[in-house]
């Protein structure tokens, strides 16, 4: 029965998970103070995302966050913790896009006693270890290609000379200079004698063995994207979880330092194993399977799996729990599992191999440590973002170096939750019920469905035969709709008005204004996974911050690497794969494509590529979305994107064979900052806006209009300010049934839009997140209005180019505009602001609303 706690949720005919379960046979009642009046629907109608009073929060998906225990602020994105051998020092590795750091915590008080900063390009990445005597500590350096080494004395760390991890020699290419391939050291562990370190090379599919005295190294291949390492049998064996695959590599380390370790076994576990922990006897290895939502129990004597612990929140639940970290109690009878997707810790009875309770955490727990009397939990995203009233950047006129970043990629502060052990049965039962409430498995089955039906005149969503899914780049709600005159906007933050976005703004006015819609992602790297598979897994979430901060990590998205496919089967994780499996027709225009030598665009995934228009350009700010705007900046630009789409759409108009779903990427609202010779930010947004207007006009004047819905959103909201939350973004739903002119303030997010489209075309939810999400049916009226839309030409459309004297033009010129988010996004935000508001215009001062409660009152630890 899943976690052994939650009974099967009731389901409606579409297969949507609704809110009606029991926990241990006891009905769960919604907490009015947390969820608001009116049950689940009331919560979704009136709450907003981000930090809330009392040390609680709401994630962009809509989950409530009520961390148990007392809370301590950590750094940006804590991903791992390690307890010293004597139990008196806890290390935390903070691996975010902003200031990375290594923190020392006193586990007896949960106080931070030391912080060692690592500003970019210096780096940390996941791995932490102590020598067996506790006198030396180690931290993996990720893109720095080294292991940081520290002397431990008096409860403090003193950094010593690092250990270097050799990069891989490049494959020679005649006539070229190929840089060495990166290893990107991640998880590590010391052997029992303390003489060697075993290091997982995350980007090199290998493990390096380092002699800590001489620095001598040897390397052995393992599986894809190894992440964590556990040594055993006195240092003679190492277990390596291959996060990008579904295996654990078993290494023989019995040779001396000069002997290359041997891979003696490969054990199949679940999909994308994130972490492992060995019991005290060394006979059982527990492995957290990130995209199988399970823990594999491996018999180390026989090197095979002897049991699987299901962590799903209810029977037959889709993926989304995302087990990320493990710890065993001192007596070995309890296994604690951080579930990053569900914001909880599962408490597992290791004898019965079943979940006996759940502990609510802050957002995205990644690591857990158990001492004799305390449970310590690292929460990577803490209480979330909240408003960022400056455009993702501190006030550039301020001389204070302490101004905190207001960029969504780095503004979230991680936290440490501390609870007493052992856990009392009544306490754990209350906490388990709280998790059920937080994540929507509470009483009042079908409450939100019925409320949505009432809002829609008592009818289900009209029959939609064709869906067109348009994804743009990186704008917040306030940037484009803040001055709309309706909805919850802040006019002072509106950068793109009717002069550059008349179609977007006009469609929002005449159809539906969604003023409580959030991007589930932080940036494009996880955004493109969220908009296509309703999730971004731990591989993606741990790597993109290093990629976005110049710390030598790859862009972990928009390719066919199975490591970031957030499903049990990586070949059936994306919406196009689900459509193909269900026999639904689809066509791709720009999603997950890259240019080829013949100047066509193709996807790596053969399922997607087979339905991709090769003449539709991918992301490239040199090429316009629409004709009649700016002149292409390079000769190799193909037909403007919407013009190519129109060519095929007109063919479907003639043939009558329009696919059930079209995916259309229109990226130029990303802009090219103030780069001299490139279009101004207003001109880029105008180009993008005109493309959208022309697409809507074509559909609304076609034979398909009566049963088509166009869904429009941004992949993320990272490039601007918003007075509600840094994740709030644009959403449009355009169909004859949505021309109502009303404001819909229902709590929606990316997965709500995906859920609505899935229902329309007849496929099941991909993950727990779109299964949970409220479909956007309240936006649809009873009657259809077939009046067509006529595209409006923005006044800013045309060859309005940045001059060499444009604000920050020189800095903008140093940035790469050929790939999404491959340049400094904080710089982008500042450049766009100054180009519109004036070179001397200060951005609004940041408002700090990351509300914390360090008293312990946010949770139940009594």
Model-predicted segments: where are they?
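Secretory targeting and sorting signals
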Residues: 15-42
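Predominantly soluble domains enriched in secretory-pathway, periplasmic, or organellar proteins
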Residues: 36-452
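Compositionally biased, intrinsically disordered low-complexity regions
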Residues: 7, 12-16, 29, 216, ...
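Terminal targeting segments of Actinobacterial cell-envelope proteins
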Residues: 1-21, 664
């Amino acid at each position: 029965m899943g976690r052994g706690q939650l009974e099967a949720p009731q389901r409606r005919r579409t297969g949507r998970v609704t809110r009606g379960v029991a926990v241990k046979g006891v009905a769960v009642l919604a907490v009015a103070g947390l969820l608001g009046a009116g049950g689940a629907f009331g919560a979704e109608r009136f709450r907003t995302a981000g930090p809330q009073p009392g040390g609680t929060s709401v994630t962009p998906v809509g989950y409530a966050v009520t961390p148990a225990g007392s809370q301590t602020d950590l750094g940006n994105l804590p991903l791992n913790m390690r307890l010293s051998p004597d139990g008196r020092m806890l290390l935390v590795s903070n691996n975010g896009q902003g200031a990375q750091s290594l923190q020392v915590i006193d586990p007896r008080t949960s106080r931070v006693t030391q912080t060692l900063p690592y500003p970019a390009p210096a780096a940390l990445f996941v791995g932490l270890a102590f020598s067996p005597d506790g006198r030396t500590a180690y931290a993996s350096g990720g893109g720095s290609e080294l292991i940081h080494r520290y002397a431990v004395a008096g409860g403090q760390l003193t950094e010593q000379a690092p250990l270097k991890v050799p990069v891989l020699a490049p494959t020679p290419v005649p006539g070229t200079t190929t840089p060495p391939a990166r290893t990107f050291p991640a998880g590590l562990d010391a052997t029992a004698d303390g003489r060697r370190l075993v290091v997982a090379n995350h980007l090199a599919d290998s493990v390096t063995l380092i002699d800590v005295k001489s620095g001598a190294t040897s390397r052995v291949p393992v599986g894809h994207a190894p992440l964590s390492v556990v040594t055993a049998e006195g240092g003679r064996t190492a277990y390596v979880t291959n996060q990008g695959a579904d295996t654990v590599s078993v290494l023989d380390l019995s040779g001396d330092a000069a002997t290359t370790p041997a891979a003696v076994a490969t054990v199949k576990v679940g999909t994308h194993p994130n972490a492992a922990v060995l019991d005290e006897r060394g006979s059982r290895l527990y492995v957290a399977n990130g995209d199988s939502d399970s823990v594999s129990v491996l018999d180390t004597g026989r090197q095979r799996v002897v049991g699987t612990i299901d962590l799903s929140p209810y029977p037959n639940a889709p993926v989304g729990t995302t087990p990320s970290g493990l710890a065993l109690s001192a007596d070995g009878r309890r296994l604690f599992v951080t579930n990053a997707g569900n914001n909880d810790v599962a408490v597992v009875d290791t004898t019965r191999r079943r979940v006996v309770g759940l502990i609510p955490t802050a957002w995205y727990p990644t690591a857990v440590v158990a001492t004799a009397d305390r449970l310590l939990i690292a929460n990577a995203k803490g209480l979330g973002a909240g408003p960022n009233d400056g455009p993702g950047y501190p006030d550039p006129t301020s001389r204070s170096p302490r101004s905190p970043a207001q960029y969504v990629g780095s503004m979230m502060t991680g936290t440490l939750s501390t609870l007493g052990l052992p856990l009392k049965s009544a306490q754990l039962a209350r906490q388990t019920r709280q998790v059920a409430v937080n994540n929507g498995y509470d009483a009042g089955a079908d409450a939100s469905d019925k409320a949505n039906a009432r809002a829609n005149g008592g009818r289900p969503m009209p029959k939609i035969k064709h869906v067109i899914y348009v994804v743009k780049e990186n704008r917040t709600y306030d940037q484009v709709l803040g001055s709309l005159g309706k909805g919850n906007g802040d006019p002072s933050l509106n950068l793109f008005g009717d002069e550059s976005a008349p179609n977007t703004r006009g469609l929002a006015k005449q159809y539906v204004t969604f003023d409580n819609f959030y991007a589930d992602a932080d940036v494009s790297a996880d955004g493109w996974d969220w908009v296509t598979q309703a999730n971004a897994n731990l591989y993606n979430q741990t790597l993109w911050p290093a990629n976005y901060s110049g710390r030598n990590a790859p862009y972990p998205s928009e390719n066919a690497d199975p490591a970031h496919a957030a499903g049990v089967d990586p070949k059936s994780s994306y919406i196009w794969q689900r459509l193909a499996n269900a026999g639904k027709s689809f066509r791709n225009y720009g999603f997950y494509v890259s240019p080829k030598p013949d100047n066509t665009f193709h996807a790596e995934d053969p399922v997607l590529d087979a339905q991709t228009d090769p003449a539709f350009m991918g992301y490239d700010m040199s090429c316009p979305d629409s004709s009649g705007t700016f002149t292409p900046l390079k000769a190799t630009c193909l037909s403007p994107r919407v013009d190519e789409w129109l060519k095929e759409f007109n063919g479907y108009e003639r043939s009558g064979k329009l696919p059930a779903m079209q995916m259309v990427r229109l990226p130029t609202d990303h802009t090219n900052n103030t780069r001299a010779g490139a279009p101004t930010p207003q001109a880029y947004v105008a180009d993008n806006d005109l493309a959208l207007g022309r697409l809507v006009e074509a559909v609304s004047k076609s034979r398909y209009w009566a049963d088509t819905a166009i869904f429009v959103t941004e992949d993320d909201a990272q490039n601007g300010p918003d007075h509600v939350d840094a994740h709030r973004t644009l959403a449009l739903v355009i169909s004859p049934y949505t021309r109502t002119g009303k404001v819909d303030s229902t709590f929606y997010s990316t997965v709500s839009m995906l859920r609505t489209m899935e229902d329309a075309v007849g496929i099941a939810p991909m993950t727990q997140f779109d299964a949970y999400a409220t479909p956007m049916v309240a936006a649809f009226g009873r009657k259809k209005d077939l009046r067509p839309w006529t595209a409006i030409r923005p006044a800013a459309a045309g060859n309005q180019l940045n001059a060499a004297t444009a604000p920050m033009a020189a800095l903008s010129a140093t940035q790469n505009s050929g790939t999404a988010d491959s340049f400094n996004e904080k710089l982008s935000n500042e450049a766009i602001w100054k180009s519109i508001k004036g070179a001397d215009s200060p951005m609004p001062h940041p408002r700090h609303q990351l509300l914390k409660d360090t008293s312990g009152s946010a949770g139940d630890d009594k």
